Design a protein with these regions (language model features):
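Conserved N-terminal beta1-alpha1 strand-loop-helix module at the mouth
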Residues: 1-86
């Protein structure tokens, strides 16, 4: 069986690079202001630019409108949206 490993809640370059070095397949970024792991989209861009391997990038949205989601995906076109909430 093949496993797909995604580490969510990344908030800094050091953690992202450690996850990359340990062989994870994907990074997840929480774009929900009420989360303790919340990160601004500009910081996500900076972190993803520091990654050398082609890790999958997930953007986690909680009850966000279509306009905000589209804006984020326009800025990080390779990202995969992940939705939570109502």
């Amino acid at each position: 069986m093949t496993h797909f490993i995604k580490i969510c809640g990344i908030t800094n370059k050091e953690d992202a690079q450690m996850v990359e070095a340990e062989g994870a397949d994907a990074l997840g970024f929480i774009l929900h202001e009420e989360s303790s792991r919340f990160i601004e989209i500009d910081k996500v861009i900076s972190i993803t630019e520091s990654i050398k391997n082609n890790l999958e990038i997930f953007l986690v949205f909680v009850n966000k409108g279509q306009e905000f989601v589209q804006e984020c995906l326009d800025r990080i076109p390779q990202a995969i949206p992940q939705f939570h909430g109502d």
